Amino acid sequence: MSLTRLLIRDFRNIETADLALSPGFNFLVGANGSGKTSVLEAIYTLGHGRAFRSLQIGCVIRHEQEAFVLHGRLQGEERETAIGLTKDKQGDSKVRIDGTDGHKVAELAHLMPMQLITPEGFTLLNGGPKYRRAFLDWGCFHNEPGFFTAWSNLKRLLKQRNAALRQVTRYEQLRPWDKELIPLAEQISTWRAEYSAGIAADMDDTCKQFLPEFSLTFSFQRGWEKETEYAEVLERNFERDRQLTYTAHGPHKADLRIRADGAPVEDTLSRGQLKLLMCALRLAQGEFLTRESGRRCLYLIDDFASELDDERRGLLASRLKATQSQVFVSAISAEHVIDMSDENSKMFTVEKGKITD
């Protein structure tokens, strides 16, 4: 699946843009603040319903406008799909697929699997466990049809259970919630464990190519003690949970621990090495999706040249080309990306929200 056409209206500093895109590499070149990252963010928002730089809708809609509008055309092997997203200042969204309204953002996410690599993406490695849970959950969402519903129900039940912890005095009063929560927690944990095991070889191979000087290990932690039933953990920790007023153990506390030579990667790797590792993990995830389902990711890479020397940029470019995926790359100068260009690439110049090719 590739994005062949992109229409942007009143998004960030872009009043209007209508772009015909390459199924291969698309380069966005311009000075800082020109709007090149806004194009990447528009694509991301079209596939996620939210921006990656700000959760405040007022920051995303162009100044003095009431809503942004994004439209795209996706070309698959057998058919073309028209998609659209409109979002107003109140945060109300309208999703359109093939001319019909009433669709969910999750449907857009399924149609447009994408990997985002930004200068802020180090949080995957040096941020809290929630960022690595999101990494695992992306894979589960695209590989397990029932994952999104189970995950949504889990979030709802945990919220209800945490509210109940402020009211109850005996564990028996929590059983109605735990009866539903326990099988969901175990199923989600199983999916995550299977996904982390399945992608392990891809992560290992890609990381060896990008960072051969380190021995990297990946360990999935499910969020409660190994070899212990979740039902037992919940009942045993009732008094502590009641004092905390939240559920201290479960899949919402899971993590993917990543170590280099036995130590946490954030304590061992330089910023350039952390970026290489982040890129390696995103590539591995995309390649695993292609092998398992035949679907390809869109790759969005903001500020391609930052933290990477010429050799590492060349390595990343060659691996991206090998995926045969659609890639969007922003850079301050065309010199940073010209070596990646070929006859199928498109180069866009961005200046003050205006985009030309």
UniProtKB/Swiss-Prot annotation:
Residue positions binding ATP: 30-37
GO BP terms: DNA replication; DNA synthesis involved in DNA repair; double-strand break repair; SOS response
Predominant cellular place of this UniProt entry's protein: cytoplasm
A single MF term (Gene Ontology): ATP binding
Gene Ontology cellular-component annotations: cytoplasm
Subcellular location as annotated: Cytoplasm
Keywords: ATP-binding, Cytoplasm, DNA damage, DNA repair, DNA replication, DNA-binding, Nucleotide-binding, SOS response
UniProt cross-references to InterPro entries, sorted A to Z: DNA-binding_RecF, DNA-binding_RecF_CS, P-loop_NTPase, RecF/RecN/SMC_N, RecF_2
Top-rank taxon, per record: Bacteria
PROSITE patterns for the chain: RECF_1, RECF_2
Entry similarity comment: Belongs to the RecF family.
Function, in words: The RecF protein is involved in DNA metabolism; it is required for DNA replication and normal SOS inducibility. RecF binds preferentially to single-stranded, linear DNA. It also seems to bind ATP.
Protein name: DNA replication and repair protein RecF
Taxonomic source organism: Shigella flexneri serotype 5b (strain 8401)
Gene name tied to this protein: recF
